[in-house]
């Protein structure tokens, strides 16, 4: 089993949200994806993150009431087509999972570790969805950095940050391989200077 898992990871690629199919994710798979997503390094077992699921009509409603309206406020001269495109971004996938980093004050556990734990949730959700055969991509885009969008998703302004949106859907084509860094460019073996 572990050899199969390593083979999967060595070939893993994301299908872009703009090319995926808005196929639904069945509830058993979704439950497993979320369960895997929460089995991450979490110093102190603080669970310093929230997971918000947008599926079905919620994708359209959130786009209409929040993404489109906010984009129009930020870009008052944008043409209708561009606003419509932004409003419908969540419809590219069958489900969109938002992960919010929600750090808490702690004497021993640094903020950075809590934020890394939230990023690990995103990565685990991405990997588990892909391992089940779904197309999946982890994105941020402009709305991940917008406080009003954060608040609309239940985040606390000045404390929380959106770690990412994981788009999950179907695929009709396997994604193309992209250039990966060469190991000798990114890996070093430390040794004491003589």
What are these regions (language model features)?
Residues 69-70, 155-157:
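Short, hinge-like loop/turn segments at secondary-structure boundaries
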Residues 102-107, 190-194:
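Helix-biased detector of long, well-ordered alpha-helical tracts
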Residues 94-97, 164:
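Structural motif
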Residues 4-11, 16, 158-194:
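C-terminal helix-cap and adjacent tail motif
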Residues 1-92, 194:
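N-terminal amphipathic, basic helical "cap/leader" segment at the start of enzyme domains
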Residues 37, 97, 103-151:
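Small-aliphatic-rich amphipathic alpha-helix that forms the alpha element of a beta-alpha
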Residues 56, 148-149, 155-156:
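Short Asp/Glu-rich motifs
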């Amino acid at each position: 089993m572990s050899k199969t898992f390593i083979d999967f990871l060595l070939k893993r690629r994301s299908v872009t949200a703009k090319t995926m199919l808005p196929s639904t994710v069945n509830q058993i798979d979704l439950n497993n994806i979320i369960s895997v997503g929460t089995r991450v390094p979490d110093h102190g077992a603080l669970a310093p993150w929230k997971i918000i699921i947008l599926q079905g009509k919620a994708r359209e409603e959130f786009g209409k009431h929040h993404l489109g309206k906010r984009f129009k406020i930020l870009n008052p001269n944008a043409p209708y087509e561009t606003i419509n495109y932004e409003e419908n971004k969540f419809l590219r996938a069958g489900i969109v999972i938002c992960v919010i980093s929600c750090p808490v004050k702690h004497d021993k556990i640094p903020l950075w570790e809590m934020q890394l734990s939230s990023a690990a949730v995103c990565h685990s959700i991405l990997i588990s969805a892909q391992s089940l055969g779904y197309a999946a991509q982890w994105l941020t885009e402009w709305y991940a950095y917008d406080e009003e969008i954060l608040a609309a998703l239940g985040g606390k302004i000045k404390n929380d940050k959106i770690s990412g949106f994981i788009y999950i859907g179907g695929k009709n084509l396997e994604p193309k391989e992209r250039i990966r860094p060469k190991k000798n460019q990114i890996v070093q073996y430390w040794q004491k200077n003589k």
